[in-house]
């Protein structure tokens, strides 16, 4: 049974998404919602993110929406270090602040500012050790920052009984096609 899931994947700019109202955001959020609802049916209690723009913040927005129906669902934002949003623009900082306001738990792995890439690696390791499953939205055909986490995830799974759901673009495309078809049928 999966009680705690870590959701991660591409940053928004890695998907060439630069606006919250881009159609891709709608479909990605619907996909994330679908995946989380499946886990909720199996006993999911917590969703963990590190607070990165893109898949992680969209996941937080989905969880906030789902909490209206599933009041036992909780989410945590556990950042690698403090002040990780300082270089973000005002809009993204405001969006992040709103998400933090709704989070059930907020902390940082390192209670310092950025000191080096080791902080990201330690945060990734923490997430693996404190969750039952990872939902990773990543396709090897479009390499980007999640490739480092994916390698750590594969190594971790080899040593433990940890499970993951690695979502490829093919799975996303199939879901989006089905969703678009059902939306077209409802008119």
Swiss-Prot record:
From what superkingdom does this record's organism come? Bacteria
User: InterPro entries annotated for this entry?
Assistant: YspA
Q: Which Gene3D superfamilies match?
A: 3.40.50.450
Sequence similarity: Belongs to the UPF0398 family.
Q: Which protein is depicted?
A: UPF0398 protein SAOUHSC_01463
- State the organism of origin: Staphylococcus aureus (strain NCTC 8325 / PS 47)
Instruction: Output the lineage of the source organism.
Output: Bacteria, Bacillati, Bacillota, Bacilli, Bacillales
């Amino acid at each position: 049974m999966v009680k705690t899931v870590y959701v991660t994947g591409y940053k928004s700019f890695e998907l060439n998404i630069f606006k919250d109202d881009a159609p891709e955001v709608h479909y990605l959020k619907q996909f994330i919602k679908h995946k989380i609802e499946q886990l909720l049916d199996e006993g999911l209690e917590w969703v963990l993110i590190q607070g990165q723009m893109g898949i992680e913040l969209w996941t937080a927005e989905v969880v906030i929406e789902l909490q209206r129906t599933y009041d036992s669902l909780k989410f945590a934002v556990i950042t690698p270090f403090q002040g990780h949003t300082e270089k973000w623009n005002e809009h993204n900082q405001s969006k992040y602040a709103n998400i933090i306001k709704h989070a059930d738990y907020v902390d940082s792995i390192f209670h310092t500012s950025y000191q080096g890439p080791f902080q990201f690696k330690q945060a990734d390791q923490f997430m693996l050790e404190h969750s039952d499953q990872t939902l990773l939205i990543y396709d090897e055909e479009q390499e980007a920052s999640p490739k480092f986490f994916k390698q750590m995830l594969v190594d971790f799974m080899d040593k433990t009984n940890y499970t993951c759901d690695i979502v490829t673009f093919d799975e996303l495309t199939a879901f989006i096609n089905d969703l678009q078809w059902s939306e077209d049928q409802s008119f």
